[in-house]
Curated annotation (Swiss-Prot):
It is found in: Cytoplasm. Its main location: cytoplasm. Belongs to the ClpX chaperone family. HslU subfamily. This is ATP-dependent protease ATPase subunit HslU. PANTHER family: ATP-DEPENDENT CLP PROTEASE ATP-BINDING SUBUNIT CLPX-LIKE, MITOCHONDRIAL-RELATED, ATP-DEPENDENT PROTEASE ATPASE SUBUNIT HSLU. ATPase subunit of a proteasome-like degradation complex; this subunit has chaperone activity. The binding of ATP and its subsequent hydrolysis by HslU are essential for unfolding of protein substrates subsequently hydrolyzed by HslV. HslU recognizes the N-terminal part of its protein substrates and unfolds these before they are guided to HslV for hydrolysis. ATP binds at residues 20, 62-67, 255, 321, 393. InterPro entries: AAA+_ATPase (IPR003593), ATP-dep_Clp_protease_ClpX (IPR050052), ATPase_AAA_core (IPR003959), Clp_ATPase_C (IPR019489), HslU (IPR004491), P-loop_NTPase (IPR027417). The gene is hslU. Keywords: ATP-binding, Chaperone, Cytoplasm, Nucleotide-binding. CDD domains: RecA-like_HslU (cd19498). The keyword DNA-binding does not apply. GO terms for molecular function: ATP binding; ATP hydrolysis activity; peptidase activity; proteasome-activating activity.
Amino acid sequence: MSKLNMTPREIVAYLDEYIIEQKEAKKFIAIALRNRYRRLQLEKSLQEEITPKNILMIGSTGVGKTEIARRMAKIMKLPFVKVEASKYTEVGFVGRDVESMVRDLVNNSVLLVENEHKERLKDKIEEAVVEKIAKKLLPPLPSGVSEEKKQEYANSLLKMQQRIAQGELDSREIEIEVRKKSIEIDSNVPPEILRVQENLIKVFHKEQDKVKKTLSVKEAKEALKAEISDTLLDGEAIKMEGLKRAESSGVIFIDEIDKIAVSSKEGSRQDPSKEGVQRDLLPIVEGSVVNTKYGSIKTEHILFIAAGAFHLSKPSDLIPELQGRFPLRVELENLTEEIMYMILTQTKTSIIKQYQALLKVEGVEIAFEDDAIKELAKLSYNANQKSEDIGARRLHTTIEKVLEDISFEAEDYSGQSVTITKELVQSKLGDLVADENLVKYIL
């Protein structure tokens, strides 16, 4: 299932498989994303008038803010980028400018479209790769041979291609010409500098420059796949589609927005650069034109989802103009002991299932008693209460601590089944959680 026209109910049902509770936040996101689909069904003139209602999510770290947005963008194949507001600086200061988040979104969008085109041409690309390798392995026919010899050669070439495709010749070595590795371009610089970089690369590093390399057939397949993909793909069409998709259905998730809010408690110690970042962010969220290396993009139809814990500040500490650009607000609930237990047992790819799969690679079967899972949830919740509340992320730390000896000595347990009991969890974590200092430094 990966479609843009999922109904809000279907969206929430999908999110329920991965994220426990937070029903209100899921509902807000589902409606916002469904409205993207609804807008695209309207007449062009009306489409221009309808802008997305941006969302402000308020909640502690680890309660599912990012995961809700990320999962949604993934299933609906929307261009998505997550940024942290605290990483940006006001124009004129050293650091990243806010426009770079839009450039990152466009980069991700073009890559998303490119991968879709590659997937559609997958069979054609693989056929071309196999044919090229087969012709390298099979010496060419001399000119002037009989029709019978030509037919024999064609049959041999076909058999060779079948063997290459099935991986029978993966270990054979072959000498092929491959393109020189392209020079990486820093996409976080302004478009003017990007163009200078690209022009310099064209002068000093020609696209057609190739080098001969001896590779295994398996390695040659990968090297040629990238080269043939570039030949078959329409780069210009991909760029245009990527730009269009970022503009009409892109999602920018701005985390830690509370870090650029100027708390009224700070009084005379207000940080002018924080307010400066907010003012730089305002035109992007309101709707402006940003230049990227692929072309210009209008930001007025991009959906912005901002998130923050707001422990030291309040949403009202943001400048009024920016507050007005996030009309939908939703507060995410803190994780209780019961929710922690549900995260471990009811999510589709729970942490427990992940660790079981990892250790199964070593031939170790791990089983968790229900009491052990309840104890893990309880101790993780207690650790959050005694130290920094990091939500569900605490579960990763506690399970890692319980399983560290088994993970380290996995070869000794190969072919065995290991049951994690409540007593084992208590012996590994009980003393640590009881001691506040140890909780802060170890868990």
